[in-house]
């Protein structure tokens, strides 16, 4: 489904559609993109290449994981402030909230494949009628 969406609408719209985070910037595997300024195709290719590298050394192993289990890489797509050098109290609180958001996304990304496994074990026996 994600692959069809990417083919039809392109990478940029896919990223804006799947990850609509309200923040000044999006931090994604070492790349910071300002909101409102879409990254170029070359930047996106670098990001996806780096993402594949983190999920597995072999492209053929990593691509099915990325397409079939999006929760495995949602945890790495975290919005952060572009300028966190200011020492005001509000920005420190915002940074703490973002760190908490990071932890929640990591927890969801780790648990979701297990939930999918449990769900598959529960529903697959009922989907096939016994002879």
UniProtKB/Swiss-Prot annotation:
Domain of life, source organism: Eukaryota
GO CC annotation terms, alphabetical: membrane
Recorded topology in the membrane: Multi-pass membrane protein
Location in or out of the cell: Membrane
Membrane-traversing stretches: 13-35, 60-79, 100-119
Principal location class: membrane
Keyword presence, Transmembrane helix: yes
Keyword annotations: Membrane, Transmembrane, Transmembrane helix
Other comments on record: Partially overlaps UIP4.
Protein name: Putative uncharacterized protein YPL185W
Organism: Saccharomyces cerevisiae (strain ATCC 204508 / S288c)
């Amino acid at each position: 489904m994600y692959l069809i969406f990417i083919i039809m609408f392109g990478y940029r719209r896919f990223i804006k559609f799947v990850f609509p985070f309200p923040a000044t910037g999006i931090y994604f595997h070492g790349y910071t993109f300002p909101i409102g300024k879409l990254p170029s195709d070359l930047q996106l290719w670098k990001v996806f290449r780096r993402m594949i590298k983190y999920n597995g050394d072999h492209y053929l192993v990593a691509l099915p994981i990325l397409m079939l289990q999006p929760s495995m890489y949602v945890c790495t797509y975290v919005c952060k402030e572009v300028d966190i050098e200011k020492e005001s109290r509000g920005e420190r609180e915002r940074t703490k909230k973002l760190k908490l958001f990071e932890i929640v996304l990591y927890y969801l990304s780790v648990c979701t494949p297990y939930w999918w496994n449990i769900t598959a074990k529960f529903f697959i026996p009922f989907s096939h009628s016994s002879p």
